[in-house]
Amino acid sequence: MMSASRLAGTLIPAMAFLSCVRPESWEPCVVPNITYQCMELNFYKIPDNLPFSTKNLDLSFNPLRHLGSYSFFSFPELQVLDLSRCEIQTIEDGAYQSLSHLSTLILTGNPIQNLALGAFSGLSSLQKLVAVETNLASLENFPIGHLKTLKELNVAHNLIQSFKLPEYFSNLTNLEHLDLSSNKIQSIYCKDLQVLHQMPLLNLSLDLSLNAMNFIQPGAFKEIRLHKLTLRNSFDSLNVMKTCIQGLAGLEVHHLVLGEFRNEKNLEKFDTSALEGLCNLTIEEFRLAYLDYYLDDIIDLFNCLANVSSFSLVSVTIKSVKDFSYNFGWQHLELVNCKFGQFPTLELKSLKRLTFTANKGGNAFSEVDLPSLEFLDLSRNGLSFKGCCSQSDFGTTSLKYLDLSFNDVITMGSNFLGLEQLEHLDFQHSNLKQMSEFSVFLSLRNLIYLDISHTHTRVAFNGIFNGLSSLKVLKMAGNSFQENFLPDIFTELRNLTFLDLSQCQLEQLSPTAFNSLSSLQVLNMSHNNFFSLDTFPYKCLNSLQVLDYSLNHIMTSKKQELQHFPSSLAFLNLTQNDFACTCEHQSFLQWIKDQRQLLVEVERMECATPSDKQGMPVLSLNITCQMNKTVIGVSVFSVLVVSVVAVLVYKFYFHLMLLAGCIKYGRGENTYDAFVIYSSQDEDWVRNELVKNLEEGVPTFQLCLHYRDFIPGVAIAANIIHEGFHKSRKVIVVVSQHFIQSRWCIFEYEIAQTWQFLSSRAGIIFIVLQKVEKTLLRQQVELYRLLSRNTYLEWEDSVLGRHIFWRRLRKALLDGKSWNPEGTVGTG
């Protein structure tokens, strides 16, 4: 089943992937002129052939080795620069000068040995600096004190031994995240945090994970306020952990994270006594992660954290929990991927959010008493419910969000009495029982989102969705309907905007199934068993934008139905269906071709039958269909008549074309001053002499040339007549021996004679390019007679001859045309 976000992502056009239109072949653009990814291209220097407008540049894995001053001067608009693993050893003063807009700089994995004091000068807008694995040994010598806009500094996986925060940290007033994980820090002293007493950074999140901590001086964190402190895999033993946590006394932290990582284990054993020091901290939110040790009880841990607002356990094994009693002031409790002996007893008066997901043990749900609860996530636990769901199950009437997805058998025994405030309800991939026996959701008039996908539900009761008057999203994929027929079950869902009916084995649907869904925008009918596209049921969906009918067995559509798609429809998916590419369905196949702008991935729509056309794209299909005898008889008679007419017209075809053109264009303006007829053997003279002198000289003339002005895909004869003669004021005939021997040239010349006869304004100018043998010339009687009786121009390649030639030719072309002093000639 395609999720809503994926469906929308495939159907709403995003930015097209474009390649650079530049002479270089290396740059694979993501967004031309803005984003360039140039990884692993073996660059030894910064490329200088990228546009000034570049904003995002990835040069990672190139052997740059050295960054000199003004290395990025050509990219003043740069915002993100990635120089990961470029073997950079030296960064000189002003290397990033002029990058006043740069917000992110990544230097990961560079063995930096020489870092100038002014290396980061000019970065007046830098917010994120990543210097992971850069051989950094101390924060003291890191020249970043002037980066007042810096919000995130990541120097993890380095050689830093001292936690002392330099004096320049008082300038970094916007710093929100400092990552010192996986360094060599072992001890923290009071003097190390002196700068935080002088200039508190109240929003600072500090990560000290994966440091082999063995000592935190008592009082080092006294009266220090942090937004977040993370200490995971930071202690080698239980005693060290206990001592260091006691050293945190006096710290006020919004979010404290302790524990280990999934694949990183330092502690051999663990018990809650190591956390006794937490009673001396002021904590708002607490998380304990990946302590996969068998804890007998964690009630002592709860006592020190009774007043936190959020308590979270991730991947913790707990042998037993007596209860979560009213004594705790938690508002959010999260238990994820933990192991319990049984489902815990929950009686928490102030709790508003409970996340209990992917846990093991205690498969039977026990009633809880959570009077303030608004958000409840019980997904992925394999839980069983008997008589779900009502206020008595959860001990609250304030619940707005309930997720029971990916559980075991859930028997519906109540229609959510006391849970009328629910807005989000998710049952997907749980096994629902008794869903079609009564109106389960009758009380949920505030529900906006409902997911019952893949819940083994068989819809046999038309009132299954009664009461859901506010519902906007309904997902019920992977279920089934009685007789594989979709009845009128959506009559009360007038506000529905998204409906997923995929994988429901549907074969038919009621013509009025969707009549009430005037607000529906997205409808997924994919992975069903429809054999024809019946569009009639969608005529009332005036807001429908996306319709997915992919992966059905559609062969065709009902002949009268194609007109009923709503005008609002923007995306229709018919891919991977069983299209029958036969004459019987020719109108439907033609409709597909006509609607290619509407259809999603239309190029993937292929024929399934007949066998000789299987796999053929529908768009490339060209069917020659047989006709009945009457049609054949009429066609034969028509062909005979047309043949007789064609024989009579054949000899006069081009004359008629010219006559029609003269009538059509006779009173209009000409596009060209002259159409040039010449042999391809003389093309060099035409390009270098005729075109250059007439189109670039004074006055200028516009010539029609077949290699430049004829329309591709149109017959040569049609181009000669329509583009050459009809749109030109005169004709220039370049006579040479090659011309006389060319059948095309003689054809053009004969058409020119007819054109001159039909058009009163037409004129033919002859240019004899080279001496022509009279015996050869006499083979073309009409041409010989015309040259004998009319004045023509002869080309003479001398200074005086060229001057006279061009003066006479321009005079002939100017005949009947206006010319202004600026040297331009109107085409008339």
UniProtKB/Swiss-Prot annotation:
Annotated ranges, domain LRRCT: 577-627
Positions in the Cytoplasmic compartment: 651-828
Biological process annotations from GO: defense response to Gram-negative bacterium; detection of lipopolysaccharide; inflammatory response; innate immune response; macrophage activation; MyD88-dependent toll-like receptor signaling pathway; positive regulation of interleukin-1 beta production; positive regulation of NLRP3 inflammasome complex assembly
GO molecular function ontology, one term from the record: transmembrane signaling receptor activity
Segments in the Extracellular topological domain: 24-629
Occurrences of domain TIR (ranges): 670-813
Glycan attachment points: N33, N171, N203, N280, N307, N495, N524, N573, N622, N628
PANTHER family for this protein: TOLL-LIKE RECEPTOR (PTHR24365), TOLL-LIKE RECEPTOR 4 (PTHR24365:SF521)
Reported function: Transmembrane receptor that functions as a pattern recognition receptor recognizing pathogen- and damage-associated molecular patterns (PAMPs and DAMPs) to induce innate immune responses via downstream signaling pathways. At the plasma membrane, cooperates with LY96 to mediate the innate immune response to bacterial lipopolysaccharide (LPS). Also involved in LPS-independent inflammatory responses triggered by free fatty acids, such as palmitate, and Ni(2+). Mechanistically, acts via MYD88, TIRAP and TRAF6, leading to NF-kappa-B activation, cytokine secretion and the inflammatory response.
Domain remark in the UniProt entry: The TIR domain mediates interaction with NOX4.
Full protein name: Toll-like receptor 4
Species the sequence originates in: Pongo pygmaeus
